[in-house]
Regions:
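Short amphipathic beta-strand/extended segments with alternating polar/hydrophobic composition
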Residues: 22-29, 122-130, 172-175
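Feature targets compositionally biased, intrinsically disordered low-complexity regions
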Residues: 4, 16-19, 25-27, 44, ...
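General N-terminal targeting signals
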Residues: 84-88, 127, 142-144, 149
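Solvent-exposed edge beta-strands and adjacent loop segments
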Residues: 1-80, 131-147
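Short regulatory "switch" loops immediately downstream of catalytic or recognition motifs
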Residues: 13-16, 84-86, 161-162
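Mixed-charge, glycine-accented linear interaction segment located at domain edges/termini
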Residues: 132-193
């Protein structure tokens, strides 16, 4: 399969739920021209059970997930939503304050375009509850040529339960046959009308 691209960063601030009830989000946002890379990593238990000198069982259930994002532009709004930075009005404009408060939680997703045997599909991801941190902020001087520099975030996906008897969920995946359907699915997840 060919992975042809990634688009449509969509997010909404987490407000409540996921503890046996549906999740509520604040106002959702869908961005264009932001996604460069997404790294989805599943964390799994790795326990083996031995008897009579050989392995008779194993357990590898999912224990967590992480989402790494490389973005073309880290705006003030993204830093406030994803990292918990606080805006403060000053005489010279607005400043972003980096405080000791923990970053808030967001639901977020994106889609990637895939091609297999000539058929195009759009694989959508939605992470129910993620807490992001910035992977540093380094800058280099301009040399003979401009060097594009981007920022990366790492998000810790927390498990949620949408029903009292339900499984722990970290993220949802959905395949759509058209780009417009992929965009609509993400908007629905983020509560965007």
């Amino acid at each position: 399969m060919a992975k042809i691209g990634i688009k449509c960063l969509t997010y909404a601030p987490y407000t409540s739920g996921g503890d046996g009830s549906s999740i509520s989000y604040g106002t959702g946002v869908q961005l264009v021209d932001y996604m460069i890379r997404a790294d989805v990593t599943e964390e799994r238990g790795d326990v083996k059970f031995y008897a009579d000198d050989h392995k008779i069982d194993s357990e590898n259930s999912m224990t967590g997930a992480s989402l790494g994002l490389e973005l073309a532009n880290m705006t003030d709004d993204l830093e406030k939503a994803f990292l918990g930075y606080v805006a403060e009005s000053t005489a010279s404009g607005a400043d972003l304050l980096v405080t000791d408060a923990a970053a808030g939680f967001v639901g977020c997703g994106f889609y990637r375009k895939e091609r297999f045997k000539g058929t195009i599909t759009y694989k959508c991801y939605w992470f129910y509850k993620v807490q992001f941190s910035k992977d540093g902020d380094s800058t280099t001087t301009k040399g003979e040529n401009v060097d594009f520099q981007t920022e990366t975030l790492t998000g810790d996906a927390l498990g949620v339960k949408l029903t009292s008897a339900g499984d722990t969920l970290y993220y949802a995946i959905c395949r759509k046959s058209s780009e417009s359907d992929a965009i609509a699915w993400l908007k629905t997840k983020a509560g965007i009308a």
